[in-house]
UniProtKB/Swiss-Prot annotation:
Domain of life: Bacteria
Organism of origin: Buchnera aphidicola subsp. Acyrthosiphon pisum (strain APS) (Acyrthosiphon pisum symbiotic bacterium)
One matching Pfam family: FlgD_ig
Keyword annotations: Bacterial flagellum biogenesis
GO annotation terms (biological process): bacterial-type flagellum organization
Signal peptide positions on this chain: none
InterPro entries with a match to the protein in the record: FlgD (IPR005648), FlgD/Vpr_Ig-like (IPR025965), FLgD_Tudor (IPR025963)
Protein name per Swiss-Prot or TrEMBL: Basal-body rod modification protein FlgD
Family per record: Belongs to the FlgD family.
Primary gene name: flgD
Function: Required for flagellar hook formation. May act as a scaffolding protein.
Amino acid sequence: MSTININSSDINLPNIQPPIINNEAVKKNDNNLPNDINPPDLQKNFLSLLIAQIKNQDPTDPIKNSDLTSQLAQINTASGMQKLNNTVDQFSNQISKNQNIQLSTLIGRHVMVPNKKIIHTKDTKTQFGIELFEKATSVEIKITDDNNKTLYLKQLKETEAGRHNFFWDGQDLNKNSVMSGQYNISVIAKKNNQNIPVNSLSVGVVNSIIMSSGNAIIDLGESGQITPLSIREILK
């Protein structure tokens, strides 16, 4: 049996030159993405490698159509996913910008948020509230000082789920005006003698909006810092 030796130098291949891609020379893409993650540039780099692979393939074992189709499908899938990710990122950034603009309008406004402390100014009424997650057969609300002395006591019956607002006149149980400062608020809610979830709510003034790791934090000064989702009500 005779043997035939095939040398790739004896075969004339098309003179296909892979395109030279210079990321610095590539025209800036329209979506302002870096060239190494921009879908059109991913395709250019892939085609450059594919052409080089075809030119340097083993003539005795050429690339099969199925392999070529598979590689093209992979780059199309990767390109499509990159485009989708870029679109989602741009959409998320736009939502964040719009949210920041809306939150900036809260500066100087009073908001009601979950809090176990209220800030009282002497000789003025202080607003506060409770948030019930289900109907309660009894509710007890207390305002106390740092010595645990009860200054305000209110008892309710058959209270529906939801938010309920109240005002404290700043007087203790003996009708004496208390000093300005922070006071504690506690709420016990029951349904048929079983404790049920309840939040105490206080009012704070929005001092500023702080961006932290892409998230908005609302600074309420003495009332602390909260997230936008903590706001239960924006007061007039």
